[in-house]
């Protein structure tokens, strides 16, 4: 059996229970629907491995070129020796970066990561039917573990009444907390904040029912 994914190990068992309870508590005071979604990663980021492999291989090839060129009597600045060294170093280093999350993260492009996580959040939003609630008042709290990014996406009924700026402070606070190791409690606080916003615009209904999953942890 394989080990747990980044998403599956993001919360402890107790934190999972607390997050689920936080969603249920928030939803008990509003007709709005909240889904907390934890993804291990939003993209494979192959360009990070390519860029990282090249940038790590380049100085090694430059260091090896004069030594090997001299050893084979081909000159200390032989371009063919350099290209061979670059290729030989690049291939294993590219694989190393691809397989090492800490290294891989160093070579991510911020704007591209933001776009890719946003696309993954949107796919999760529609894939898990947050656009299909009775009052169009579903809110997705999307956490992408590898990229260390958070998105909050709301359906049309919420967006018609709540300014997008309302979510930015929550996203920034949760992102900072997660990066400092505060996961479960910070997510619970954010869910409570989302519930407070929904309660102001979508009071509970007598016939209200839970339309969506409370917590989804992707493998």
Label for each model-derived stretch:
Residues 3-6, 146-182:
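Flexible, solvent-exposed short loops/turns enriched in glycine
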Residues 107-127:
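Membrane-cytosol interface motif
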Residues 169-219:
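Cytosol-/stroma-facing membrane-proximal "stalk/adaptor" domains immediately downstream
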Residues 46-58:
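Select subsegments of transmembrane alpha-helices in polytopic membrane proteins
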Residues 10-34:
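Short, charged cytosolic
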Residues 65-106:
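Transmembrane alpha-helices and immediately adjacent membrane-cytoplasm interface residues
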Residues 33-38, 138-144, 151-153:
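Soluble periplasmic/extracytoplasmic beta-strand elements of cell-envelope proteins
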Residues 3, 8, 12, 43-49, ...:
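Alpha-helical transmembrane cores and adjacent cytosolic helix/loop segments
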């Amino acid at each position: 059996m394989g080990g747990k994914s980044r998403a599956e190990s993001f919360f402890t068992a107790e934190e999972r229970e607390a997050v689920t309870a936080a969603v249920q508590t928030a939803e008990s005071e509003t007709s709005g629907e909240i889904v907390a979604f934890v993804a291990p990663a939003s993209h494979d980021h192959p360009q990070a491995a390519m860029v990282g492999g090249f940038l790590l291989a380049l100085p090694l090839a430059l260091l090896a070129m004069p030594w090997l060129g001299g050893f084979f009597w081909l000159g200390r600045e032989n371009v063919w020796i350099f290209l061979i060294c670059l290729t030989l170093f690049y291939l294993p280093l590219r694989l190393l970066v691809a397989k090492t999350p800490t290294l891989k993260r160093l070579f991510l492009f911020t704007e591209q990561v933001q776009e890719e996580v946003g696309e993954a959040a949107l796919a999760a939003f529609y894939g898990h039917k947050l656009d299909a609630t009775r009052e169009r008042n579903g809110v997705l709290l999307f956490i992408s573990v590898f990229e260390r990014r958070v998105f909050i996406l709301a359906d049309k009924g919420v967006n018609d009444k709540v300014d997008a700026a309302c979510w930015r402070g929550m996203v920034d606070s949760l992102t900072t907390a997660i990066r400092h190791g505060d996961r479960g409690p910070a997510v619970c606080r954010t869910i409570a904040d989302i519930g407070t916003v929904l309660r102001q615009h979508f009071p509970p209904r007598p016939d209200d029912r839970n339309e969506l999953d409370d917590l989804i942890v992707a493998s």
